[in-house]
Amino acid sequence: MVQDRLFQKAISVLLIAGYEVSERCAIRPRSFDLIAEKGGLLLIIKVSSPIDNVSEEIARDLDLIAGHLEGSPLIIGGRARDTDLERGAVYLRYGIIAINPETLYDYLVDGIPPLVYASPGGLYVNINGDVLRGLREQRNMSLGDLGAVLGVSRRTISKYESGMGTTLEIAIKIEEVFDSGVIESIDLLKYTSHFANKPQERLPVQALAVLERIGLELHALRRAPFQALATFEGEMILTGYGTAQKVVKRAGLIGNLSAITHTHAMCVAIDGSIRKKVGQTLIIGEEELHDIEDGEELIELFD
């Protein structure tokens, strides 16, 4: 019930903000639940409460999908362990931003970005180090002078000016001292991957060999409704595979996701001879793939 309410809140906020929202992904396993798009901006969204349920495996999928679709991964939740997520605060789960629906509303609808982020020990803010240094120098204050006023060391002030975050309490003191803003807001749509040397999953040998033979580059996923992202000369294909019965069930959802992300959708049936379109999705048998000469010929089948 809690999860359903979160879904409804998240979808409502996205629609109010003018986003086109995909169907809810109800297929298990799933690394994301929704994809939303507005003016070329893509959000890959996982709804989870508590946010601790988002595993590293799920986060890696979110990261990989966001990277290749040039989107921003986002976790929408209500709690972290036994604590409610605070409005206007950002939480991190394996480097993926997590917020509550109210913070999403403030950002997307009212244009109010969050200012604080949660970290062990409490809530923190980012300080604009260049602004802080400029204000300090205008007052002819040394690092030690400002440190004495704030009750911290000169080395800590130096770190603030180099970009280190601080507690909300200290940041407020700084702004009171200079009567000027130094706190930097957090851009929810600015994402930098925290995963290095991402392990590549291998697709089943036959499907992998056929698609690679015709020149496609493949990126396997573990928990998405499509098992791979395939690329060919700038064209992206959301690719699923499995028995004919299985891929027909997934074809509609994968097609809907491809429409939102402005990509192609393909399902490879490994147990039959078939080639047809179901909505946006090309369903093709593995045998038919063997007859395709190259990636360009495959792309033409989507038209």
UniProtKB/Swiss-Prot annotation:
Entry-linked InterPro entries: Arc_TR_HTH, Cro/C1-type_HTH, Lambda_DNA-bd_dom_sf
Residue intervals of the HTH cro/C1-type domain: 132-189
Keywords: DNA-binding, Transcription, Transcription regulation
Entry annotated with the keyword Transcription: yes
Pfam families to which the protein is assigned, alphabetical: HTH_3
The entry's DNA-binding region: 143-162
Gene3D superfamilies for this protein: lambda repressor-like DNA-binding domains
GO MF entries: DNA binding; DNA-binding transcription factor activity
SUPFAM superfamilies membership: lambda repressor-like DNA-binding domains (SSF47413)
Recorded superkingdom: Archaea
Protein name as annotated: Putative HTH-type transcriptional regulatory protein Mpal_0031
Organism name: Methanosphaerula palustris (strain ATCC BAA-1556 / DSM 19958 / E1-9c)
